[in-house]
């Protein structure tokens, strides 16, 4: 009997963990640390390091796994590994004065790769953007510059922004822009919105020449399976399209968690055709991004109170897409 297919899953490991050596389920490794590296394909596994924290004792490796025979390669700067059912890839936009063209090239490369290899369901993306709140060479904020490039890639390939999955767009302390993703060959992929927050690609132009494009969460399950993964986008203290509780990290953290709870709850999942529901206690492998180091203890306390004691939580000290946001939270529900 053929074993059932399971959706990709994540583990947080210590840097250099020996138990990753020879792991045939390993699809990709992203190291979060106090420096960055280039994208590589080591022993059939895409790897890179992103500069997402300022203390080495907060560093860790984000390891993505999937069952099944694996092969790997590279295509137009994207290092990738795949099983018969899932594809993981990593690419980098080099550091520079402008990012739109480089971002457009990376994303068109990703879209072409998933089409060529036959994994059309893009299920999750991450984008770590160096100097995210700083001006580019033309005076445009780097995050907005990035959003222009991503939107241009969608335009070039005729992709509806509403089909884009859960995503993270967060700061890094150097290294250009690192993009990585998960895509599926088949199965169910359901993108979800938050009824209390405006759909990202409908944000008004005050947030930039082109809006961000992502869903608030994405459900991914193998063909014919009842179980799967719910990928929760990096989620902030936003209601409608407005940042709330300016300068109050505790209140913003609470709203972030409330937004996650609303997205993953039974009422919202039912609205998107899924007969299931989750609570904050079901969210695991969370990454919590905090702008100011002095706020980390407050954020840790609130997360400890609201999340499961069994949850794996990594806190990273880095900038956030809007200058008035102090914290963002992402996670996975399995």
UniProtKB/Swiss-Prot annotation:
The active site is at 328 (proton acceptor). The keyword Cell division does not apply. It comes from Streptomyces rapamycinicus (strain ATCC 29253 / DSM 41530 / NRRL 5491 / AYB-994). It is an enzyme of class 3 (hydrolase). This is Chorismatase. Substrate binds at residues 143, 150, 203, 216. It catalyses: chorismate + H2O = (3R,4R)-3,4-dihydroxy-3,4-dihydrobenzoate + pyruvate. Its EC number is 3.3.2.13. Keywords: Hydrolase. GO terms for molecular function: ether hydrolase activity. Monomer. SUPFAM superfamilies: YjgF-like. Belongs to the FkbO/Hyg5 family. Pfam families: FkbO_Hyg5-like_N (PF21168). Disruption phenotype: Cells lacking this gene are unable to produce rapamycin.
């Amino acid at each position: 009997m053929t074993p059932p297919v399971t959706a990709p899953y994540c583990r947080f490991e210590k840097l250099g963990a020996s138990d990753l050596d020879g792991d045939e389920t390993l699809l990709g490794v992203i190291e979060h640390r106090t420096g960055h590296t280039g994208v590589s394909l080591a022993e059939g596994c895409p790897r890179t390091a992103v500069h997402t924290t300022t203390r080495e004792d907060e560093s860790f490796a984000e390891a993505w796994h999937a069952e099944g025979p694996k092969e790997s390669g590279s295509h137009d700067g994207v290092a990738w590994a795949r099983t018969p059912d899932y594809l993981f890839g990593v690419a980098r936009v080099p550091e520079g004065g402008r990012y739109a063209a480089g971002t457009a090239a990376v994303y068109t490369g990703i879209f072409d790769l998933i089409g060529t290899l036959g994994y059309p369901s893009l299920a999750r993306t991450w984008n770590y953007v160096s100097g995210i709140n700083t001006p580019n060479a033309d005076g445009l904020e780097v995050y907005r510059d990035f959003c222009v490039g991503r939107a241009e890639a969608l335009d070039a390939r005729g992709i509806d922004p509403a089909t884009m999955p859960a995503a993270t767009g967060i700061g890094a302390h150097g290294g250009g822009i690192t993009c990585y993703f998960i895509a599926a060959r088949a199965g169910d992929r359901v993108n979800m919105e938050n009824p209390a927050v405006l759909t990202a690609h409908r944000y008004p132009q005050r947030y930039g020449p082109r809006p961000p494009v992502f869903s608030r969460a994405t459900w991914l399950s193998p063909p014919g399976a009842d179980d799967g993964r719910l990928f929760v986008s990096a989620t902030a203290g936003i209601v409608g399209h407005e940042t709330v509780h300016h300068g109050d990290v505790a209140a913003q953290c609470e709203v972030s968690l409330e937004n996650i709870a609303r997205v993953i709850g039974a009422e919202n999942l039912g609205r998107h055709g899924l007969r299931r529901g989750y609570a904050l206690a079901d969210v695991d492998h969370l990454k919590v991004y905090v702008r100011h180091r002095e706020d980390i203890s407050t954020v840790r306390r609130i997360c400890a109170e609201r999340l499961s004691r069994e949850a794996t939580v990594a806190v990273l000290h880095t900038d956030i897409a809007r200058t008035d946001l102090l914290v963002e939270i992402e996670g996975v529900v399995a």
